[in-house]
Amino acid sequence: MWPTGVKATVVRPFDPPARKWLSGHRGVDLDAPEGGTVVSAGAGTVVFAGKVADKDVVSIDHGGLRTTYEPVRPSVSAGDKVKAGDPIGALEAGHCVPASCLHWGARIGKDRYIDPLSLLYPAIRLLK
């Protein structure tokens, strides 16, 4: 499910670094209005809701997959269970100045970042 609640325009795509320690864009930026409701992309448990480097962040564990949403003023707390589509907070200004956008990230395990857009569309399987 789109964390904006509806299909959103991708302002900046996923751009993984060539090496884990190099710079890159480990998520996608989605066009969204400041103050708009941000929803959980899937069922899971909130593992973090608070500030990281002066930016509000919500992180949700989906059983080995973790999604992050920023800058989001949380309406949830660590330990809360959420379903896909449940509100988790409101989008704050500051990420895509002068416009507003939601940075949505996804990772498997400790450091394997994936394109969160891949969570929206099931894999296509060709039948033989």
Predicted region positions:
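Soluble periplasmic/extracytoplasmic beta-strand elements of cell-envelope proteins
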Residues: 9-11, 27-29, 57-59, 68, ...
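Solvent-exposed coil/turn segments that connect beta secondary-structure elements
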Residues: 15, 35, 51, 63-65, ...
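Zn2+-dependent peptidoglycan hydrolase active-site motif and core
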Residues: 41-75, 100
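Conserved, short, structured surface segments that act as functional micro-motifs
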Residues: 58-61, 80-128
